[in-house]
């Protein structure tokens, strides 16, 4: 059920924090997305990047009518199914929406309306860097016990997700947001919850090319810019499409800022962008599908080089112009660094399948069982975007 709080503002010496509920109607019922404002800030380790400036889902997304019981994680949309018009909801104390692939997670997030989208890789990095800067990296459900607990802080527990546990008695996911405040990104009541463990979460706009694209295996593909505003961001929902054209009249892009980059449309198809106006992309060839889209670029950097999948993060790519904004591992080993929670980094450069699923797409945070490898910096580039699985979920964000 919706949290009784509709609006709360808390101010301290570090930042202004706002919680707000945004209504959305589905099936004749009004549901409330509980969101947290992430203020803008800079980090001393990352020169030239301003993080924050968006609304983040306080909770991992659920289906609107989710409940804590058998089938309570899929009352509106079946496992693996197209969500249709069903919106994902950020609401307290229910099971996460699981068994949903990346393409459908983008759609379910955007079903809330203008400005709503799947959390981006940059927005996730903002949460990670804020918590690291303020000494509040979140604890979470990563021990796989009942009640759900943190492996380093076993006295910290949450409520068991009975829908997940009914699927397999050895799965101990938690109801979203039911852990202590230390499981929030700021260790306070007004924070973003469950960023450490519980569910791997799809991130918009961070992919890795595979051996399917000769000479490009391991290349990071990232968002076309770091703008988080409704008018400037490199993602959204088209207002019209035609041969070699996608238009989004809500935008005010800089002319040709995306030339030579790629459009990934609602079907996952990738198109080369020849040019753009303030509101339209002109493509080299083809007709894009209408709906959700993202604009990305190939950085040319092999983020698997010199790394071993499953190691722990030692340092981040803070000096890489294309990658420093995404809280990504630069080096790793079997021990890791406490500065980044000894969180893990996984990847797979093997051919993932046929296009558009011949890439790997980022999930972050870890699930209920990786132990110390889970955390807000944990990054897994091992899943193709069409994968559906029990520990894969997602989170909403909203642009202004």
Predicted regions and their residues:
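Cytochrome P450 core scaffold surrounding the K-helix E-X-X-R motif
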Residues: 66-67, 204-217
